[in-house]
Amino acid sequence: MKQRKETPKSSDLPIYLFKQGNNQEAYRYFGAHLCEENGEAGAVFRVWAPHAKAVSIVGDFNSWTPGEHPMEKVTDGIWERFVPGIKQFDVYKYCITTPADELVYKADPYAFHTETRPSNGSKVYDIEGYTWGDAAWVSDEEKRDVINSPMSIYELQAGSWKMKDPENGVPYNYAELADELIPYIKEMGYTHVELLPITEYPFDGSWGYQVTGYFAPSSRYGKPKDFIAFVDKLHQAGIGVILDWVPAHFPKDGYGLYMFDGAPCYEDPNPRRGEHKEWGTMVFNYGMKEVESFLISSAMFWVERYHVDGLRVDAVASMLYLDYNRKDGEWEQNVNGGKENLEAIAFLQKLNTAILGRYPHKMMIAEESTAWPLVTKPASDGGLGFNFKWNMGWMNDMLSYMKTDPLFRAGNHGKVTFSFFYAFSENFVLPISHDEVVHGKCSLLNKMPGDYEEKFSNLRTFFGYMMAHPGKKLLFMGQDFGQFIEWDEKKPLDWMLLGYDKHRELQSYVRDLNHFYRDTPALWQVDYSWEGFQWIVPDDSKQSVIAFLRRDAAGKMVLVVCNFNPVLRKEYQMGVPNPGSYKEILNSDDKKYGGAGVTNGTVKAKKGPMHGFDQHISLTLPPLSTLYLSVPAARKPRAAKAEDKAAEKPAKPAAKKTAKTTAKTAAPAADAGTEAAPKRRGRPPKAKTTV
């Protein structure tokens, strides 16, 4: 047990940094920490309550008696008290006397552990002492270039992926969940899991997006060290862990951050800025230095103490705009007369600089649903400083397109190609998330038009296109085997569907697609540059066909062809970059995936210009399908033989006897190495694209 330092000045630095907005590890100072004082075991408690007249600690240890353990004001707004006899798991709250002389009972904002809802007290907990086994993962991660690495994310909600006791709604704890999850993730080929928020929250129906405990993994699924074990086990299995993290707002629950000491403390005091009325939640005061320290410390805590590999920051757009979901008269302009939330922008820049400055190999992912510029550019260059952003525009366009009856897809072809106008403006993740399979939106499979067979064909086509499109990938649980009904957080997924051929075959397709993606650098190594992508057929809207190349850093290519129409296309011709044989390596219409088995095998390129190339191939495109074909390497020119060289030499003219002749040899031709395919980087022709 730690020996508590007695000298008050020992706390001067963390307090100073806290008040400057620069304490990135405020959790080490605030909250409850087991220690010894004068040889007596107990815990020291510290809390920030700037408007409080008095604060005391209450709990089982003093029968919840206000004033029995009063706290001392260390400095302006910060209260402290050592309580002897406190033990691990003791439940406590802060009893705060407000400026109006009312008593409010508050959970500890910095608590590491909490009671399980409906109870809401904080628990004393020591997170030290766990022996990590993920040293190999951490070492490899520190060398990893996350931008130019494969990333196929499996998004899940911890309580409803599977359940320990479905009849009674009993979930697995974190460690048990890891044991169930790891074999599935490895078999399916995902690189990361992303958990919906596990920071403590009171209301199950919020899915974790209304947080009351920014330093506590939800006790629904076990103790903090159970969650440490979850991350550790996944890392040892070679699987990354991303957490959803919510700095955009917090709920009004009376025991939480709302009006913490009887006055606005964590929330913006301006009613036109401090509340999301549509959500019924409060907005953080991003201009308050102590709130900055609180939030950045929370983010750093999960990265540093729980070894998570990235944070997906929720609802960034709501932070950036003062008029977000607000009517005229419900918001006010910033000091420059604009609608941008300048304090929130500065906070996000500071947050990302702090995390990525210390851990450049981690991921800071923005869920930003507008066209805000430079989201994934460094703060030093005027950006927000994230290194990834969800591509919500692509998601909306493609789901709208896929829901369209194929008879009318020709008129909506621009929804397939439009994303390439901006695909390389940010470091995008392509998200098919939980938000798209709830609230009457239908499951992904049920969004697809057509009969039973066509729904699966459409979905396989979409998954094939998604995996080939530039950007990292994210798929919500259940969609990879064709969950038919919407997600319900109270129930596990319908795993019994895997007893049906079509669902099992769809799952096999996604599995093979994931492994093919990971094994094919052309699909991920140059995700954020035109150098990694090349159109071949962008504008065949009449037949709803597109074709393009993906290219890795060494120039190796994969040809991708998508037919979004339920019509068989025989002898469909397209230009190709190199002569030689093109081998079909993955076909969504393969019988083993539930298709009709219309395949191409190997096709040989024929001479004849098309689509800007000197040769072309002819394919059979199955109805509703995505095809992947290997591209042969460019041929090196044949080395010239001696007699060829002699034949190529021009005859020397007869030398004039009256003139001095100087023999000159022609300059040698430039070395012809491996010929690169002609670069055709152009975007889809505007005249032929419907947007």
Feature annotation, model-predicted:
Residues 88-92, 601-636:
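C-terminal beta-strand-rich structural cap/linker in extracellular carbohydrate-active enzymes
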Residues 502-523:
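Catalytic cores of secreted or luminal carbohydrate-active enzymes
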Residues 635-691:
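Intrinsically disordered, polybasic Lys/Arg-rich low-complexity tracts
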